[in-house]
Regions:
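Beta-rich, blade/repeat-based domains predominating
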Residues: 26-39, 68-87, 91-92, 107-123, ...
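C-terminal closing repeat unit and adjoining cap/tail of repeat-based domains
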Residues: 222-248
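Short loop/turn segments immediately following the C-termini of beta-strands
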Residues: 47-48, 88, 127-128, 171, ...
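Beta-propeller domains
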Residues: 42-63
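Structural signal for beta-propeller blades
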Residues: 50-54, 91-94, 130-133, 174-177, ...
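Short loop/turn segments immediately following beta-strands, especially the blade-tip
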Residues: 137-138, 179-186, 233
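A short beta-strand motif characteristic of beta-propeller blades
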Residues: 20-26, 60-66, 100-106, 142-148, ...
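Blade/loop signatures of beta-propeller domains
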Residues: 4-20, 135, 187
Length: 248
């Protein structure tokens, strides 16, 4: 068996060259905010219809999950299977417990995307203000804290499995920004660690949703498709969009 070494990994070691996109759901207006739970079930929002979140199980079945929601732009499971939800148009972050009980966590913000650490620390991006925020979910009274400013149009946020590194994609710029998460939950060591490939000079990267696998390979959706980077920030390859004229 091939050893589990991620550094300098070409895409062909992760995805077979003859792999093709498979349709798992249809009839949506605009899909956003995908995430998975601890069992590997896949969730996404049909933001264009403002309906319930959709859950895709291992057998490929697609079911509605929870109540109808307005303007969902980010999803992430936290502790105790709680699903945290960015609702930018509704100006709040909500939490869905057990798939039915919905509560507001933070109001009067315009969250685009979020992550939650294993010790209940929530980070989210607010694209319009170019900010990254932190909220300690363990506190009874939730306090907003600005932990970064200045990324041109922050659009996606990700977290490494060890909760030590946070990274943010930029819709306009090609740089993906990386931070170290300190013990006091602040962000330090900000650096443009990886660069997205763009369609042509001076065009936006359309960097969006981010994720990372167990070997710290980074995945960022973009204008060209899903771009994969190894732990050093080197591009391993691009999974092209199923529609070459549209971003992922």
């Amino acid at each position: 068996a091939m050893p589990s070494v991620a550094q300098d990994t070409p895409l062909s070691m992760v995805l077979s060259p003859d792999s093709e996109w498979e349709k798992i759901a249809s009839g949506m207006k605009f899909c956003d905010a995908c995430c998975t739970d601890g069992e590997g079930n896949f969730y996404f929002a049909d933001t264009g219809n403002n309906g319930p979140i959709r859950k895709v199980s291992h057998d490929g079945s697609v079911k509605e999950y929870g109540p109808s929601l307005y303007g969902v732009s980010g999803l992430q499971f936290g502790k105790d299977s709680r699903l945290y939800i960015c609702q930018a148009k509704a100006r709040r972050i909500s939490v869905l417990k057990n798939g039915d009980s919905l509560e507001t966590v933070i109001e009067n913000v315009r969250p685009n995307d979020l992550v939650v650490t294993k010790n209940n620390q929530l980070y989210f991006i607010e694209t319009s203000t170019q900010r990254v925020y932190h909220v300690n979910l363990n506190d009874k009274i939730k306090v907003l804290r600005i932990v970064d400013t200045g990324i041109l149009k922050p659009n996606g946020i990700g977290l490494t499995p060890c909760d030590g590194t946070l990274f943010v994609s930029d819709h306009l710029d090609k740089e993906v920004w990386f931070f170290r998460i300190e013990k006091n939950h602040r962000l330090t060591m900000k650096a443009p660690y990886a660069s997205l490939r763009i369609r042509a000079k001076n065009l936006p990267s359309r960097g969006d949703g981010c994720d990372v696998d167990s070997l710290n390979r980074y995945y960022v959706t973009s204008d060209l498709g899903i771009q994969m980077f190894d732990p050093t920030g080197r591009l391993g390859g691009i999974i092209l969009s199923p529609d070459p004229l549209k971003p992922v």
